[in-house]
Amino acid sequence: MSEIPGDLKFLKSHEWARVEGNGRVTVGISDHAQGLLGDLVYVELPAVGDTVQAGNGAAVVESVKAASDVYSPVTGTVVEVNASLSDKPETINEDAYGEGWIFVVEIDDKEQLNELLAPDDYAELLEDDAH
């Protein structure tokens, strides 16, 4: 299993959130999730300006095996999307925690971040899933 970055927060549905410090949160899917999905062939991005709700679908990733919703970890407004994923969805497979980010949300309520899983808790969830 790949290393889980210590600066991220997670949802049980395998999305990650990186708090940028300027009231913005970058969102992607975990390396575990991309591994389960296999080779990604398409990413449906939200539109800049869309309002997203914590726990609701905001994007879709499709592999040769399945399509999966990407849930927003926080409520807010989409301020940026990773448009390069339209041409290269496999970037998520190659670098899930870096270049494979999906969208950025300007967060409405920073308290929501406290409800997300810390890296250690996420690692524990993955271990439990494996048994």
Curated annotation (Swiss-Prot):
Keywords carried by this UniProt record: Lipoyl
Intrachain S-S bonds: none
In-chain residues carrying the UniProt-annotated modification N6-lipoyllysine: K65
Cofactor(s) needed for function: (R)-lipoate
CDD domains in UniProt: GCS_H
Cellular-component GO terms for this entry: cytosol; glycine cleavage complex
InterPro entries named in the record: 2-oxoA_DH_lipoyl-BS, Biotin_lipoyl, GCV_H, GCV_H/Fam206, GCV_H_sub, Single_hybrid_motif
Limits of the Lipoyl-binding domain: 24-106
One Pfam family this sequence matches: GCV_H
Cofactor info, note text: Binds 1 lipoyl cofactor covalently.
GO biological process: glycine decarboxylation via glycine cleavage system
Function statement: The glycine cleavage system catalyzes the degradation of glycine. The H protein shuttles the methylamine group of glycine from the P protein to the T protein.
Family label: Belongs to the GcvH family.
Quaternary context: The glycine cleavage system is composed of four proteins: P, T, L and H.
Protein name stated in the entry: Glycine cleavage system H protein
Natural source organism: Xanthomonas campestris pv. campestris (strain ATCC 33913 / DSM 3586 / NCPPB 528 / LMG 568 / P 25)
